[in-house]
Amino acid sequence: MITHLKRGQQLLLRHLSTAPPPLPRPPPIADRRVVVTGLGAVTPFGHLQPTWEALLAGKTATRTSTQLASSDLALPTHVVASIPDSFDPAPYLTNARAQSVPFIALALAAATEALQDAGLITTNHDETQTVTENDNHHVLSVPERTGVAIGAGVGSLAEVTSSHTTLETRGLRRLTPYFVPRTLINLAAGHVSMKFNLRGPNHSCATACATGAHSVGDAYRFVRFGDADVMVAGGTESTIDPLSIAGFSRVKALSTGFNENPSVASRPFDKRRDGFVMGEGSGVLVLEEYEHAKRRGAKIYAEIRGYGLSGDAHHITAPASDGRGAIQAMKSALLQSGLSPNDVAYINAHATSTPMGDAIEARAIHQVFHTEVQGLASARESLLKVSSTKGATGHLLGAAGAVEAIFAVLALHHKVAPPTANLHDIDDDAPTELNFVPLEAQPLSNDARATMTNSFGFGGTNASLVFGQI
């Protein structure tokens, strides 16, 4: 017995002497401030800078898809908002066979841009390197404290359909072993994690069109409660393919009345709206604990002040007619932020250009911000600017919430509200206390304190984010 104990002690000591060093101890759980230090996106306008410039100029990116228009499937819409043909994913890929599926490639591109914008990496034609601080300490040299939260709503139905065709026509041995990794939604986050050696929380959610906002909100909580010091967070999507278009057409979600004039097909809050335009892209934000960001002298765009989420418990595709889920999400985000309705200068609405959804959201916003809501400070005293940038970009599904969170951050940072494109004739019963920013960008007050973004998805899933001036 004693011999066995001594041998066990020797094995334990040998293991301890060769074991890797312990992981860094996380800070005690507390409410830590979380700021936005990097932004990256790929949209139907291109990367982030040309996208923002196009938004403010009132341009639209919706156009005719020659693939859909020439298809013999008799699809009811040919209008999409696709990534520019000039976009080249190759520089962002480290394993083209595994990463070339568009929703993964777009996430890698947006994450690279966001990390570079945050000053955490430098890039050249051949490699990506971490940036060093003045004391030669790598900002990302504690990879366990930096994580990823990137989701997608659908992923790649095109990969599924093409692989099924390969299996049926050419047999099992011709099916690529990359099929499953190309279609798993969490592999967008996985590839970003692997490319940049980020070993903190590796998280991916799939909440339909609220995915991007939920990913940012979840990442905010990871930083706030000490699971990470830095999070790379957002959403990605690429579903412009015949099966996706057919599927969304069957639930009567897509615009079908503007095939001859595609640039005006997406028209949130407008009387002639008849459905959304399928878009694609990716948006990524770098979220960082405030003191961590200050220590390294990071540029800070805004602070995340609130994150509200809810469920309608109503219908698989339609929102509750009383807007209860949207109201609860917005109210929760506001209460968490500690701000009053008067502090919010601009809302980037989810409004996708559907007849029902836009009207319900407008009434919900009005109820939260212009009527007395239990638990909130007094109602607003002035018009609230509310716009939907989907009139310009189309609907990016799982990427929409992240891209539009970026727009809300930039609206606060630059003190300007991007317009609602194609909004010529507002609903007669639209709340008159809301300024829907039709056609042209409008300035925000220099003392604007906060902005909000809403994202809602099939199944009644809702998310609202509040960004505050730092």
Identify the function of each model-found stretch.
Residues 44, 154, 208, 352-354, ...:
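Glycine-rich phosphate/pyrophosphate-binding beta-alpha loops
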Residues 33-37, 63, 261-337, 345-346:
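Condensing-enzyme catalytic core mediating Claisen C-C bond formation in acyl metabolism
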